[in-house]
Amino acid sequence: MKTRCFDHIDLRVTNMEAAGKFYGKILPQLGFVHESPGDDYYTFYAGGGERPLEFFCLSEDKNHRPNGTRIAFWADTREEVDQISKLVRDAGGKNLEGPEVCEDYSPGYYAFFFEDPDGNKLEICCREKPVFAD
């Protein structure tokens, strides 16, 4: 049986220093507990111990152009979504929508949609009832 379905996210940014500062204020609140900066990358790790590591990596690409891809991070409660949405705005993220209830997604879906300083689209969400496969 698989222990997880993805290993990491590698997001392109145009300014590593600015992106490291921005994500350094947000990702620790989402469970990423270790930072590993490098010259052309910046990695935030979650997991460890009995859990395999998962990581969110920033890679600098001066020619990067954002697209319609959106990455959604899980929050345990609506209050956590609200708290992180404030951190995002204070860190310079662009508020696109919310925080708000998105019933058309699924019952009890609550989310905040935003762009990072490079224009990459992200989301913080929680669900009253998580989705399970049949």
Describe each region flagged by the PLM.
Residues 120:
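Conserved Rossmann-like nucleotide-cofactor binding loop
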